[in-house]
């Protein structure tokens, strides 16, 4: 079965996500692979595909902060901390928040926190809005290989039949910056 999706085929991507599949899609700098954050089956598939240990934790990417609220606890953020986060969103900055009490370990790994981002990439915004929630999002690359930046690179690493929302990345050179929402500490330079 050929799972490639025509450019902008958001409805087909949502159908695949609802069936616990992992899909590829362009983000601000590189292609991402993602899935339903509420499906342990889908997340396990993603982790196996990436050869990534569950204890490392994952990133959620969303169209809006409202989509992220069920997964994080932002109640302890001060007004200044909240402003620092919202000044960067939507955009290519990922923030680590305390996880909500109900966020599953397959998302947080060994941590009591969760990395989240409100994207400004139009295809991902449309995908998350159509899906009605965030996606688990990690760079589209197999273990030991560089992240994919083009449709052709995704096909070369994952195969011609890997389900993908085709489109261009946002053109940034580096993956998203990662910061602590409470302290502002920089974990990864963007």
From Swiss-Prot:
List each copy of the YrdC-like domain by range.
7-190
Q: Name one GO molecular function term.
A: L-threonylcarbamoyladenylate synthase
InterPro entries the UniProt entry points to? DHBP_synth_RibB-like_a/b_dom, Sua5-like_dom, TC-AMP_synthase, TC-AMP_synthase_SUA5
The UniProt record lists the EC number as 2.7.7.87
Q: Name one GO biological process term.
A: regulation of translational fidelity
SUPFAM superfamilies membership: YrdC/RibB
Coiled-coil region(s): none
Q: What is this protein's function per UniProt?
A: Required for the formation of a threonylcarbamoyl group on adenosine at position 37 (t(6)A37) in tRNAs that read codons beginning with adenine. Catalyzes the conversion of L-threonine, HCO(3)(-)/CO(2) and ATP to give threonylcarbamoyl-AMP (TC-AMP) as the acyladenylate intermediate, with the release of diphosphate.
Sorted UniProt keywords: ATP-binding, Cytoplasm, Nucleotide-binding, Nucleotidyltransferase, Transferase, tRNA processing
PROSITE patterns, per database record = YRDC
Name the UniProt record assigns to this protein: Threonylcarbamoyl-AMP synthase
| Top-rank EC class of the record's enzyme | transferase
Q: Which NCBIfam families match?
A: PRK10634.1
The UniProt entry's sequence similarity note says: Belongs to the SUA5 family. TsaC subfamily.
* Location in or out of the cell: Cytoplasm
Q: Which reaction does it catalyse?
A: L-threonine + hydrogencarbonate + ATP = L-threonylcarbamoyladenylate + diphosphate + H2O
Q: Which Pfam families match?
A: Sua5_yciO_yrdC
Which cellular components does GO assign to this protein? cytoplasm
Q: What organism, scientifically named, is this protein from? A: Salmonella arizonae (strain ATCC BAA-731 / CDC346-86 / RSK2980)
């Amino acid at each position: 079965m050929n799972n490639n999706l025509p450019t902008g085929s958001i409805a087909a991507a949502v159908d695949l996500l609802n069936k616990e599949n992992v899909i590829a899609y362009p983000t601000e700098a590189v292609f991402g692979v993602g899935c339903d954050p509420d499906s342990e089956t889908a997340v396990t598939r993603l982790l196996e595909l990436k050869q990534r240990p569950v204890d490392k934790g994952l990133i959620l990417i969303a169209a809006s902060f409202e989509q992220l609220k069920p997964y994080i606890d932002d109640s302890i953020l001060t007004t200044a901390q909240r402003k620092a986060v919202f000044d960067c969103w939507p955009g290519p900055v990922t923030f680590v928040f305390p996880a909500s009490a109900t966020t599953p370990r397959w998302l947080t790994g060994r941590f009591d926190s969760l990395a989240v981002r409100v994207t400004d990439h139009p295809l991902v915004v449309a995908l998350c809005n159509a899906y009605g929630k965030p996606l688990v999002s990690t760079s589209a690359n197999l273990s030991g290989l560089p992240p994919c930046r083009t449709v052709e690179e995704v096909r070369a690493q994952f195969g011609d039949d890997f389900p993908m929302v085709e489109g261009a990345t946002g053109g940034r050179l580096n993956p998203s910056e990662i910061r602590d929402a409470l302290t502002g500490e920089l974990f990864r330079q963007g």
